[in-house]
A protein has these predicted regions:
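Positions that flank functional sites
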Residues: 9, 78-79, 178
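Pocket-forming structural segment of enzyme catalytic cores
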Residues: 20-21, 41-48, 54, 61-153, ...
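Flexible gly/pro-rich beta->alpha loop and the following alpha-helix that scaffold active-site loops
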Residues: 1-54, 67
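Short glycine-rich anion-binding loops that position phosphate/pyrophosphate groups of nucleotides
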Residues: 28-33, 59-61, 147-148
Length: 194
């Protein structure tokens, strides 16, 4: 694994210095994705469809704006607080129980009514704030909360799910989008708009 600051190099340098990259994680950071994300958005645009991409916090926001959605005030400021996460049981969430605790550090979120058709909501808070997005065709997943936080549940399983993917298109990974049986009671109803 190599950690690279998004403002430390250009996309061309990233491609030249890491020609065999197998996965891309766009990690958290302060600010707004349109002003403060370095090469994150161009990297998403370039690598989408080639390798799996995971966005965390600002990473979700970068994915949102890359595909034409809007990131705006979430309506609440949460820093270091946990919320139950209602999810679809697929992709990153495969094998996770409903209501898994997610640690949140954000004041911005994807505006639900701005999302393009290519992105689907995969998880929400009980109050309806978007906590996860997935590209419908490309292996691009994201969460607004921090699965790597000590206060979040099942972060290791989510990372294992992501690292198990070896393609850039969901059509090449059909099992990834098949829910893991009994772990997802009434997933469709839990993701209905609040």
């Amino acid at each position: 694994m190599t950690v690279i600051r998004s403002e430390a190099l250009t996309l061309e340098q990233l491609k030249a210095e890491h020609p065999t990259m197998t996965h891309l994680i766009i990690s958290p950071g302060p600010g707004h994705p349109l002003k403060d994300s370095g090469i994150s958005i161009p990297a998403i645009d370039y690598y989408a469809g080639k390798i799996p991409i995971l966005g965390v916090c600002m990473g979700l926001q970068c994915i949102t704006v890359n595909y034409g959605g809007i990131v705006d005030q979430a309506g609440e400021y949460v820093h270091g607080k946990t919320s139950p996460i209602l999810h679809d049981g697929k992709g990153l969430f495969k094998g996770l129980q409903q209501g898994v605790a997610g640690t949140r550090y954000h004041s911005l979120a994807a505006r639900i009514n701005s999302l393009p058709d290519c992105l689907e909501v995969t998880s929400r808070t009980e109050g309806g704030i978007v906590m996860g997005l997935r590209h419908r065709d490309l292996v691009v997943e994201s969460v607004q909360y921090h699965p790597e936080s000590i206060l979040s549940d099942e972060g290791k399983l989510m990372l294992a799910n992501f690292l198990s993917w070896n393609a850039g298109k969901w059509s090449d990974l059909p099992d990834a989008l098949t829910p893991a049986g009994s772990h997802v009671p009434h997933a469709a109803s839990t993701l209905a708009p609040a």
